[in-house]
């Protein structure tokens, strides 16, 4: 058995792929979601957003019965390219044993919301399928890169622009010698890092354990022992800033709040919106004005969970002690805004009174992700926004 394996994917017909596969709803407005569901009856949105479990299952089964979704005959790898105007990344979709996650050959870096993981578990259990891949990162491998380059010179089975504004293309690799070569090359890689899909990963692990205990004839070869992963080279992964919005000043006036945070930060008013270009520097938007914030003193070197992670620095030195923000997973006074929205969205949210103030952060770096994962540490939720992301439903 290999580290990463081929599989017989369940996928949409070529003419239906663009209407079946979906972008994460985290990236879409409610209006776009409603219109897409209405105009694309075969979209997976009509499975995930069905009124109940039964309707969801019925819709999924109907898509298979109607041959909107068909299963490949051969064990295959799927080469997957995502392109924007200024970025592209090419990965491979395969399956890995869940034991690789449990044994830390596949490593996560973020805390999860228990309720969200449970929702994912129930959804996959109901459909008896994994519709969207875990998004993984592997250390660059020149031989894999060359192999992939050759394959993408051929015509793709899918090529379309999705609701996320990205171009998505896919190629099938099912020739036995090429499949074996990919398997062997992945066997030289020590570990894969989870970029996105921590809740899905935890749900898959729990679901696999449940099904194992329910099956008296368990062999370890059943499909529930595996999970689907889209793996991209580390050098091609892109992390955007993940910014914060806070509902109120925790009883402070603007003047007193700024006076208080000046005890720990150098605070300077800016003429324009402020996007940090180095670690341990933050932007703050409050009362129609931008400020730069820089820590007066570097944190103690023994506090590893704080060092080099701006999200923790902001929390421990400002959000928690001054604004009273507790665990960001459950505190409804804080919200999160991915960097692809732009800092103008912070201004829009604050100016419309959806939030009292916003903070712009320097993006978490890939070396931070790897360092935390290797040390079995976790970052707070919403620490990284990998962009672009794989679609759900191109292959299941």
Where are these regions (language model features)?
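Surface-exposed, charge/polar-rich loops and edge strands
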Residues: 1-396
């Amino acid at each position: 058995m290999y580290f990463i394996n081929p599989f017989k994917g369940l996928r949409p017909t070529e003419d239906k792929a663009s209407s079946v596969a979906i972008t994460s709803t985290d990236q879409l407005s409610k209006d776009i979601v409603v219109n897409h569901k209405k105009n694309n009856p075969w979209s997976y949105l009509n499975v995930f957003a069905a009124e109940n479990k039964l309707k969801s299952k019925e819709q999924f089964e109907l898509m298979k019965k109607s041959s909107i979704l068909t299963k490949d005959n051969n064990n295959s790898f799927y080469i997957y390219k995502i392109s924007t105007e200024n970025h592209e990344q090419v990965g491979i979709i395969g399956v890995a044993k869940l034991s690789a996650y449990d044994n830390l050959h596949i490593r996560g870096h973020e805390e999860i919301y228990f309720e969200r993981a449970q929702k994912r578990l129930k959804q996959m259990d109901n459909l008896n399928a994994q519709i969207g891949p875990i998004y993984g990162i592997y250390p660059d491998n020149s031989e894999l890169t060359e192999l992939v380059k050759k394959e993408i010179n051929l015509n793709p089975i899918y090529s379309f622009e999705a609701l996320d504004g990205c171009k998505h293309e896919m190629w099938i690799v099912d020739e036995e010698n090429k499949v074996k070569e990919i398997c062997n090359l992945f066997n030289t890689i020590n570990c894969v890092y989870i970029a996105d899909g921590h809740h899905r990963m935890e749900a898959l692990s729990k679901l696999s354990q449940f099904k194992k205990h329910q099956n008296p004839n368990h062999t370890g070869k059943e499909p529930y022992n595996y999970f689907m992963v889209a793996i991209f080279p580390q050098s091609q992964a892109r992390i955007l800033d993940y910014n914060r919005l806070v509902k109120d000043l925790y009883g402070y006036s603007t003047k007193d709040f700024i006076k208080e945070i000046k005890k720990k930060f150098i605070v300077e008013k800016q003429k324009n919106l402020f996007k940090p270009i180095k670690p341990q520097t933050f932007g703050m938007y409050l009362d129609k004005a931008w400020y730069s914030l820089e820590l007066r003193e570097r944190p103690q070197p023994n506090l590893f969970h704080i060092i080099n992670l701006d999200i923790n620095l902001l929390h421990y030195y400002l959000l928690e002690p001054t604004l009273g923000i507790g665990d960001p997973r459950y505190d409804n006074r804080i919200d999160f805004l991915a960097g692809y929205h732009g800092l103008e969205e912070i201004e829009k949210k604050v100016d419309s009174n959806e939030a009292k103030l916003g903070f712009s952060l320097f993006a978490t770096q890939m070396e931070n992700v790897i360092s935390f994962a290797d040390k079995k540490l976790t970052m707070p939720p919403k620490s990284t926004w990998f962009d672009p992301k794989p679609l759900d439903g191109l292959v299941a």
